Amino acid sequence: MESINDVSEICLQLVNLNYSDQLDFKLNLIKQYIPNLLTNQVIASPLVDNYRNKLRFDIGLSNHDLITIGYSLPKKKNTHRYVYSSISMKHLHPKMIQIVSKIELFLRTHEQSWYSIKHGETLLPSMTIRTSFHTEDVMIIFKFKGPQNETVINYFSSDIFYEIIESIEINIVIEFSDCRKIVKGHNYIHEKLDDYIFKITDESFFQVNTLATEVLYNKVLELTMKYIKPTGQDILFDLCCGTGTIGIYLSKIFTKVFGIDIKQSSIIDANHNKLLNNIPNIEFICNPIENVLEKLISECLEKNPDSTFFAVVDPPRTGMHGGVQNTINNCPNLEYLIYVSCNVVTFKRDMEILGKQFEAIETICLDLFPHTPHCELIVVLKKIDLSIY
């Protein structure tokens, strides 16, 4: 029979290794894909335990017939579909442990037919918690398998619910099949990264390890300053910009920043973050990179032939999409590209194309995901001078 240990080892595969051994494991794993890796260390996360600012939890029956908030095994391994408690897992933020415990108590003591343990399938399969390290903001997103339901809304806005969660100040959103409903507060929280503050909505992407993200962005800033050749007309392209975090972070050393992303909600959030941080020299564009990058470079050169161009890309775990790699290769004026990757497999795949025009000249490995095999890569790519061949 499956057990909580099975679930813990699936979520946190390296949890039984001491931390220095975890870092060695990550480095060796990366070298399997990149044998000529330009570094021999993985920088440690500032926080090894309790580091996550976002987690999704399953809701369902435990093996003791109790409604439980935690994790279940994949279907092929979970014959009973039990959900196992998550509160002892090392990656949870302390507030998450507190919230999970209180909401679990509420669900057990105020049971409803739409998620009852007496029924085969719950209509409340999961919840997500987003929290912050520097602002104390918290948001809970409940997922409901069905259209908007006033009974469900009233349940999570009842006095009894808030009596149980007591002093925790939270924002609550319910994701129905046909809409998202704000039950309490807002559908966003705020988080600080060094001197900057960012709005994070229920749909936003934001790095899951806040303290390590500050290290990550400072490393990107250091590398950018190391390789940029200031002319007074320095232009940055923040590709796959999401909510604008990296572009905003680097904006102080560039004349102009263009953030490009295909997700409209991300661009809306990015523009809000631009105003929140009073960054006048950044422009966010909702469009495929393939459609606008070369055009933007041409327009900048028309305005000022002395313009220099730098790019940073932080794609999702699946890597670059479509023809982005070829689009980047087709920009002769783009001398440097910093590739930030959380997946060495897709980075290697993308480099099979980017490597036709760019070569890696510096790499930093940083642990954003303690107790798991995952690791963040920062790779500086420089345009190859093909004229010498």
Curated annotation (Swiss-Prot):
Protein family according to the UniProt entry: Belongs to the class I-like SAM-binding methyltransferase superfamily. RNA M5U methyltransferase family.
GO MF term set: RNA binding; RNA methyltransferase activity
Keyword ATP-binding appears in the UniProt entry: no
Protein name, UniProt field: Putative RNA methyltransferase R405
Annotated organism of origin: Acanthamoeba polyphaga mimivirus
Source taxon at top rank: Viruses
E.C. number(s) listed in UniProt: 2.1.1.-
High-level lineage: Viruses, Varidnaviria, Bamfordvirae, Nucleocytoviricota, Megaviricetes
Pfam families noted in UniProt: tRNA_U5-meth_tr (PF05958)
GO biological process: methylation; RNA processing
Keywords: Methyltransferase, S-adenosyl-L-methionine, Transferase
Residues holding S-adenosyl-L-methionine: Q207, D261, D314
Keyword S-adenosyl-L-methionine: yes
Catalytic site positions: C342 (nucleophile)
InterPro entries (UniProt xref): MeTrfase_TrmA_AS (IPR030390), SAM-dependent_MTases_sf (IPR029063), TRM2_met (IPR045850), U5_MeTrfase_fam (IPR010280)
